[in-house]
Every structure is written in C-alpha cells, then in structure tokens.
C-alpha cells in the first residue's frame, strides 16, 4: 500500500518540500532507498548521502535541509525530529502490513472460568490463564503464554510466545513483553541460619517467601528472556514508558522510574531505585539498596556500588586496548602500592635533604 506525501503529513505532521502527490510504499536507508521509498536523515554526518540518494522523499530537519547544495527537484518532509517521525511512520506501516489475529480463545488454550477476558482479546494456542485473571481489550497472548492467578493485563498489550507472568502481577496498557520473559518470579531472598565457623559451620539458608508482586505501568516494553522478580513484601515497580532490552535481570523491590531505558545484559540487584529518564548501558551491574537520581546515564559494563543522586554520565568500565598494553597496565596496577611507598620515601628524603640545607 502506497501513500502520497500529502497523506503522510496529514496524519503525522511536517512540511512538504517538493511534490505533494509523490507516493511512497515503505521505508529504507538513504543509501538503499528507491523512488517509491522514504528515507530519513537523523545524523548530519550522513548529509552527503542525501545529495546522492534515490529515495522518493527524505525526512529531514530544517537546519540540515538548509545545508544541502542542491535540494531542488527532490522531495522532503521537514520535521524537527526525523528519527522519531521515522519511528512512528515505520510502526504505522508495520501495523498495516501485519495480518490481524483472530479474536477469541484458541481451542487448545486453558482458561479458568473465573478469568475475565475482553471480547476483543486474542488468546493463542496452549495459553494458560489462571483464576481471577483480568485481560483487557485488544490484548494478544501468543502461543504458550502463562498468566498466573489474579494477574491483570491492560488493554492493547502484546505478550509474545512463552512469556510467563506469575500470580498477582499488573501490566499496564499497551505493554509489550517479548518471548521468554518472566515477570513475577521469586526474588532472591534467603536468610542465613548458620552456626560455627569454617569446616565446623552447620545450618542452611532459609527461603524468604516473596509475597509482593510486580506492577508495570503503561507503554512499557520488556525484551526477550528478561526477568523481573516479584517483591518480598511490596511490589517491584516499573513505571510508565520504561524500555528494557533483552536478558536484563531486575531484582525484587526495585523501582525503575518513568522513561528510563535499560540495555541488554544489565543486572540490577534488589531494592534499588532508578530515577526517571535514566539510561543504563549494556552489561551494567548495579548493587542492591542504592539510588540513582533522575537523568543519570551509566555507560556500558560499568559497576555501580553506591548511590548516584546527581544527574550526569558515569563510567567505570575499562575500554578495550591492545593486549600487550593491557598486560603492561595490569602489571603497573598490581604494583601501585609498592610505587606509592617508593614515592613517599622519595618525598621524605627530599624533604629531609631540604631541611638539612636550610
């Protein structure tokens, strides 16, 4: 299905420069787009590609359009944020191209008679819905999804195959949960009950029942194989519009503030609070019982062991270097205490010599 630039602007806004009747049917990168495709410029370092692209039209901001040597004869949609415009337009194209699932409950699904399921919901093959569950309008549960007792899933949410949502959890409207994610599994809570020391130590770990739940706000997206533990007594809370990548672990009683994004393989220990509009890089590790303020950015592979209350960018990871350089640096680090002692001795000797001269 193709649309004129005029039709696109009527729905998404922006200003057309060029042929308002030109039709485009999908999106493509600047260096690959053809006359029936729409491209976008989000980074001015690719401005040269706009000069040579074959795209039928380009999403661009006014400042970058003004830098073009020869914009005449081509089509543009001018918008302050071409990247966000592209994202919304791409979603619209996908929605139109995706076949609509058949509403209702698949014959192979197991649904408790007390569950409340909206007539517009889609319950796929082998889905299990336990007692007291409430599923809103236009919710889609793909194959093998499990929804535990007393859980609520808000309207417009989509749970992909093999998602498990344990009992007593709440998912807000338009939640997207990708395949294999687990929401509401037990938090990692064990009380030590040991007597003695060393080889004479006896006893065991006593499991602490996790009686809280998980509360997820609207417009949250959770990546594949991510796990969000239920709270020990109160809920683990994920606020509105949080975006969580694949393979992220969020411990019990954490609170993740609205509009925060968390990249893949990050691990957040229990009872940690992360503020609003934060950015957590890939493979970041955050210790338990710490607080990150609003607008905190933690770069990839950093370890956070204490609270970071002030907005800013924080880094503790060591970037990759040549292997031989790393070995030399590691050798120096192992000997820093000896070097410190030598420097102190030299400073003392200099001070003593200066005193003798005086």
Curated annotation (Swiss-Prot):
GO BP annotations, alphabetical order: lipid A biosynthetic process
GO MF: N-acyltransferase activity
Gene3D superfamilies reported for this sequence: Hexapeptide repeat proteins, MurE/MurF, N-terminal domain
Gene: lpxD
Pathway: Bacterial outer membrane biogenesis; LPS lipid A biosynthesis
Name of the molecule in the record: UDP-3-O-acylglucosamine N-acyltransferase
Keywords, sorted A to Z: Acyltransferase, Lipid A biosynthesis, Lipid biosynthesis, Lipid metabolism, Repeat, Transferase
Residue ranges of the TM segments: none
Metal-binding as UniProt keyword: no
Xref: HAMAP family: LpxD
Residues the record marks as active site: 252
Catalytic class of the enzyme: transferase
GO CC aspect terms: membrane
Signal peptide: none
Function: Catalyzes the N-acylation of UDP-3-O-acylglucosamine using 3-hydroxyacyl-ACP as the acyl donor. Is involved in the biosynthesis of lipid A, a phosphorylated glycolipid that anchors the lipopolysaccharide to the outer membrane of the cell.
Catalytic activity, as annotated: a UDP-3-O-[(3R)-3-hydroxyacyl]-alpha-D-glucosamine + a (3R)-hydroxyacyl-[ACP] = a UDP-2-N,3-O-bis[(3R)-3-hydroxyacyl]-alpha-D-glucosamine + holo-[ACP] + H(+)
Subunit structure: Homotrimer.
The species this protein was found in: Paraburkholderia phymatum (strain DSM 17167 / CIP 108236 / LMG 21445 / STM815)
Keyword Hydrolase: no
């Amino acid at each position: 299905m193709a649309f004129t630039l005029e039709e696109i602007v009527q729905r998404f806004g922006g200003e057309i420069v060029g042929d308002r009747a030109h039709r485009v049917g999908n999106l493509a990168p600047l260096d690959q787009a053809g006359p029936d495709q729409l491209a976008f410029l989000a980074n001015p370092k690719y401005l040269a590609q706009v000069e040579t692209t074959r795209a039928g039209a380009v999403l661009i901001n006014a400042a970058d359009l003004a830098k073009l040597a020869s914009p005449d004869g081509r089509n543009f949609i001018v918008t302050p944020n071409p990247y966000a415009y592209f994202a919304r337009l791409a979603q619209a194209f996908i929605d139109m191209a995706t076949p609509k699932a058949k509403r209702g409950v698949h014959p192979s699904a197991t649904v408790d008679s007390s569950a409340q399921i909206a007539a517009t919901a889609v319950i796929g093959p082998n889905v299990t819905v336990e007692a007291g569950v409430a599923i809103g309008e236009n919710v889609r549960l793909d194959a093998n999804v499990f929804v535990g007792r007393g859980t609520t899933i808000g309207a417009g949410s989509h749970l992909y195959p093999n998602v498990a949502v344990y009992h007593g959890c709440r998912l807000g409207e338009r939640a997207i949960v990708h395949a294999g994610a687990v929401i509401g599994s037990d938090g990692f809570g064990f009380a030590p009950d040991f007597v003695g020391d060393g080889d004479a130590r006896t006893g065991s770990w006593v499991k602490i029942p996790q009686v809280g739940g998980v509360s997820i706000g609207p417009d949250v997206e959770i990546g594949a194989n991510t796990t969000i533990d239920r709270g020990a007594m109160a809920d683990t809370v994920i606020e509105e519009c949080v975006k969580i990548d694949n393979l992220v672990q969020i411990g019990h009683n954490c609170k993740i503030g609205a509009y925060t994004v968390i990249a893949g393989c990050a691990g957040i220990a229990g009872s940690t609070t992360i503020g609003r509009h934060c950015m957590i890089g890939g493979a970041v590790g955050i210790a338990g019982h710490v607080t990150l303020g609003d607008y905190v950015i933690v770069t990839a592979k950093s370890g956070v062991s204490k609270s970071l209350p002030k907005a800013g960018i924080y880094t503790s990871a060591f970037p990759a270097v040549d292997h031989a350089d790393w070995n030399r640096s590691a050798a120096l680090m192992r000997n820093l205490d000896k070097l410190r002692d030598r420097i102190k001795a030299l400073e003392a000797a200099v001070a003593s010599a200066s005193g003798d001269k005086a």
